[in-house]
Amino acid sequence: MIVTSMFRGIACRCELQLLLTPRRMLRNFSSLEQKQSPKIESLPPEERGKYKVATIPNAICTARIAATPLIGYLVVQHNFTPAFVLFTVAGATDLLDGFIARNVPGQKSLLGSVLDPVADKLLISTMFITMTYAGLIPLPLTSVVILRDICLIGGGFYKRYQVMSPPYSLSRFFNPQVSSMQVVPTMMSKINTVLQITLVALSLSSPVFDFSTGANDVIVGLGCITGFTTIYSGLQYASGKAIKKI
């Protein structure tokens, strides 16, 4: 009996060691993730598009992100004309990817709901920083815009962590099939985005078209309104009104 118990104890310890090996643990986590994640093939056709990654709007957003450093570099170098042209094209692509996502079946995705505002914020933040460096936008307004965006990004990551269920990993964190959530812009946020883009476009075109003093005064007034909407929409996001768990 004693010998049998010893062999059983040794066998149990060996089995436990096998289960706790790194490779086996990763395999167990992977199988658990597969059980907790919905299979795209098992979803209705109208639901499958939400989990797509390779969509036309996502490709357009990626191109806009890739072009952002070039536009910022042109502003820093005071090459305002090509910077204005590229910024106008980037703004047009923002409208284009939104139109495609809303009107073309299978092109609206959860990744796009996050990637599109990230691309917008990256472009706008880059423009505000570089245009402040070039003397086109005042530093206090840029500080408000950048601080709001940093808080939104940090809050978005924290909210994503909150809606996730264990086990926690980077692959599951960025997997749209795991505890999905969607960012829904508020009306004030949409107005703020339009005002920010308009302010950047007018400020950037001022040295290109040599605006008069009166036109520059209008830009200053627009900057004050933009500062207010930036703060107000940031408070709306902080309250969680723009985050929806799916």
Curated annotation (Swiss-Prot):
Please give the superkingdom of this protein's source: Eukaryota
State which residue ranges cross the membrane: 80-100, 127-147, 191-211, 218-238
- Subcellular localization(s) per the UniProt record: Mitochondrion inner membrane
Q: What is its main location?
A: mitochondrion
* Gene Ontology cellular-component annotations: mitochondrial inner membrane; mitochondrion
Q: How does it sit in the membrane?
A: Multi-pass membrane protein
What GO MF terms are annotated?
cardiolipin synthase (CMP-forming)
Give EC number(s), comma-separated.
2.7.8.41
Q: Which GO terms describe its biological process?
A: cardiolipin biosynthetic process; regulation of cell population proliferation; regulation of mitochondrial membrane potential
If you read the UniProt record, what top EC class would you report for this enzyme, in one word? transferase
Q: Which reaction does it catalyse?
A: a CDP-1,2-diacyl-sn-glycerol + a 1,2-diacyl-sn-glycero-3-phospho-(1'-sn-glycerol) = a cardiolipin + CMP + H(+)
Q: Which UniProt keywords apply?
A: Lipid biosynthesis, Lipid metabolism, Membrane, Mitochondrion, Mitochondrion inner membrane, Phospholipid biosynthesis, Phospholipid metabolism, Transferase, Transmembrane, Transmembrane helix
Q: Which family does it belong to?
A: Belongs to the CDP-alcohol phosphatidyltransferase class-I family.
PANTHER family referenced in this protein's UniProt entry, alphabetically: CARDIOLIPIN SYNTHASE (CMP-FORMING) (PTHR14269:SF60), CDP-DIACYLGLYCEROL--GLYCEROL-3-PHOSPHATE 3-PHOSPHATIDYLTRANSFERASE-RELATED (PTHR14269)
Please give the function described in this protein's UniProt entry. Catalyzes the synthesis of cardiolipin (CL) (diphosphatidylglycerol) by specifically transferring a phosphatidyl group from CDP-diacylglycerol to phosphatidylglycerol (PG). CL is a key phospholipid in mitochondrial membranes and plays important roles in maintaining the functional integrity and dynamics of mitochondria under both optimal and stress conditions. Required for proper mitochondrial membrane organization in germ cells, but appears dispensable for the functioning of muscle cells.
Query: Which protein are we looking at?
Result: Cardiolipin synthase (CMP-forming)
Its organism's taxonomic lineage begins at: Eukaryota, Metazoa, Ecdysozoa, Nematoda, Chromadorea
Q: Which gene encodes it?
A: crls-1
